[in-house]
Amino acid sequence: MAHITRFETPWFLVISKKQYKWTVRPNAGPHPIEKSIPLAVVIRDYLKLAETVREAKHIIFDGKVLVDGKVRKDYKYPVGLMDIVSIPSADLYFRVIPDNVRFMRLSKISADEAHYKYVRIMNKTTVKGGSIQLNLEDGRNILVDKETAKSFKTLMTLKIELPSQNIVDSFIISEGSYAIFVGGKNVGIHGVVKNINLSKFKSRKYSVITLESKDGNTYQTNLMNVMSIGREKSDMRVD
């Protein structure tokens, strides 16, 4: 189905449900449909660079829009958390970050910042030849040797260069590190990790993380909803 009614769209999409009956349905891709924004909606409703889907299509089909450093000409391409949306011809660069009100929002960044993406390791697998494949949250994979793989843990965040995928840095959730909630009722809250309560009877992903925001309030959620984005302070722009 190419389109869905606006009333069937995810609650967080920034679109007017009274203006038109139909809107764009995102294609299958690196992010779940229920957690993604169609590229045409990003251009029209989030960035206000077009008034209609047709106008947004022209911008996209002209090859002016990049997602994670690659030109995307699919107007239904699913854009999700931590993706980099770039329009170099207009000197516009954005990172999709968690938001406590609308789940996701586009944060304006510099051209230099747009060269880097933050993405979590969801699991690791051994491939033919003995190399280890790091399977990342946005569907991409990175091959490393066995020795290097030992330093990478599940749910660790990688800072990768775009579009090469070279690993520039990595961040693990630990007490004193900086993190942001990417799921749960407090999505978008960020601050310093104060405590990690490891689950005794369930897998590590159910560990409870306590985070203290810059206003001094504390919040808790399970590890699956937390993304490390720095050591003592955030490595990326979050405000």
From Swiss-Prot:
Name the UniProt key words of this record, in alphabetical order: Ribonucleoprotein, Ribosomal protein, RNA-binding, rRNA-binding
Output the PROSITE patterns linked to this UniProt entry. S4
Q: Name one GO biological process term.
A: translation
GO molecular function annotation: rRNA binding; structural constituent of ribosome
Q: Which Pfam families match?
A: Ribosomal_S4e, S4
Query: Which residues, if any, are the signal sequence?
Result: none
GO cellular component labels: cytosolic small ribosomal subunit
The superkingdom listed in its UniProt entry is: Archaea
Which segments constitute the S4 RNA-binding domain? 37-99
Q: Which stretches are annotated as coiled coil?
A: none
In the record, the note on similarity to other proteins reads: Belongs to the eukaryotic ribosomal protein eS4 family.
Task: State the protein's name.
Answer: Small ribosomal subunit protein eS4
Origin organism is Saccharolobus islandicus (strain L.S.2.15 / Lassen #1)
